[in-house]
Amino acid sequence: KKIVFLLAFLCMLLLVGCSNGKETSKYNIEYLNKDKTGIVAVPYDASATTKDALIEEFFAALSSDPDNVEYRKPIPNDVEITKYSLDGALLTIYFDADYLNMKEVEEVLCRAAVVRTMTQISGIDCVSFYVDEKPLTDVNGKMVGTMYAESFVANPGEQINSIQNTNLTLY
């Protein structure tokens, strides 16, 4: 009986040690593509485990050049995150005044990359941006407000300029 039990235990131990070798990353860091016309999710293995440590680690990744030359960091060199605050599920990020020097398209992509990256952290559902201690406004002076990952439409492929024609029969 002891031998059968020991063999069964060893078999279970061997099965536990086996895996398919494919470990997927729990997180993605969103980078800009080479042309700065879209964002690309790149798998990322975080070393941090706490919420605050993950926030800091993601800020560092978003501000650093990626390993792949096909991607660009979303937060430019001259833009600095001065502080952040976490109030429930809302992460508020404070940038210095240099944030306003970004081109319009790059700024929107930066926001999308930061928001989509940060909302992957458990407990963070939305993000708000402040620039020079004031809420971020768009080109029309309207406050941008709270942003969610779903606030940014993903555009698969090159469909932004595509036009389709069709003939319809109306009755």
Describe the function of each predicted region.
Residues 3-7, 13, 18-171:
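Bimodal "functional hotspot" detector
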